[in-house]
Swiss-Prot record:
Name of the featured protein: Recombination protein RecR
MF GO annotations: DNA binding; zinc ion binding
Organism expressing this protein natively: Limosilactobacillus fermentum (strain NBRC 3956 / LMG 18251)
Annotated gene: recR
Family: Belongs to the RecR family.
Keyword NAD (UniProt): no
Chain intervals annotated as zinc finger (C4-type): 57-72
Amino acid sequence: MQYPEPIARLIDSYMKLPGIGEKSATRLAFYTLGMSDADVDNFAKSLRAVKRDLHYCSVCGNITEDDPCPICKDKTRDQSRVLVVERSRDIMAMERMKEYHGLYHVLHGTISPSEGTGPQDINLESLLKRLEAHKEIQEVIVATNASLDGETTAQYLAHLIKPAGIKVTRLAHGLSAGADIDYTDEVTLFRAVQGRTEM
């Protein structure tokens, strides 16, 4: 027996989300069916608002409603340091720590030869232009994940940035291999930032 078309389309839509297979998508679709009209309307409005109201900061690449984002606009932050992360949600993890007060740059991915992702496919060019335009930046802290692709990206960044005389450091390896920054607790992140090593 096939599901009615609206349910089948909703299942297909949920399956486009990362980590959601057919069983989970079916469960979510039927849960949605049982929600009140008001809750479904609010859910739909939230989805539309994310696409309509959010965009990438023209300076750092973080998700924001304003341009530049609140972090880039905050002149009380340490303007001499830029912490480079893979995704916007990594910034949220670092900010929860409340110990890093510098700036950020979001790559929106990593260099991954196995996935066919090269330097031109990530937000790298804007980082290089930013470093060239803002001579007050003295240190780039590379906070890509401790995976093969994260390490490849970190080495590539160091290779590009060090010749400009900017200090390049890497988070200490208190992070386990393959660990995602956004799933790491604040104490471990704090130790990783404090114990960063020069590349």
